[in-house]
Amino acid sequence: MESECLELNKRFITYNTHQRPYIILKWAQTANGFLDNEGKGMAVSSAFTKMLSHKLRAENDAILVGRVTDERDHSLLNVRDWYGKNPVRLVIDRHHPCFDGLDFSKGKAEVLHQIMSFLYINKVQSLIVEGGAITHQSFLDAGLWDEIRIETATSKFVKTGTEAPRLPHDVKPISHAEYDDNVIDIYERSRH
């Protein structure tokens, strides 16, 4: 019963304990571990897994991508294939900061901590990070993550592209689901 309560309240608990949102890193990759095809965006999700992605967006307060992903994909980052409230859309871009006072002069980790503080102050309890590779790796390197969701298109291969981030060593698989030719794996931090 205790584990069910913790799962149900994980966003609230993380927000109040760590003074930051609960962070979900989410990406879709090819069977051979690429996020794109030679730097060009491509559809990896099926219609069904795209709908699941929009459901996840509706369940969380904010969504974040890096500048390159935003410029390449022009994604609306909203809830189109599900119902519910759109998450707050954030883009990490030094030329167009997502809020006043964001200081890029101190490095990636500090920028992420500034964003987490901003989200905490604005009562954002949950954040999905949808890309790209540099942004995901920055969150991983800073230890700013609670859950990782990876969708793999098991029958899609590309010759070259942007490699998917590497999973950290302190992960524990918590879910594996197959949907036609796509698989969604969910990981959380190992509790020692």
Please annotate each region the language model reported.
Residues 1-7:
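Active-site loop-to-helix "anion-binding N-cap" substructures in soluble metabolic enzymes
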Residues 7-192:
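Enzymes that bind and transform nitrogen-containing heteroaromatic metabolites
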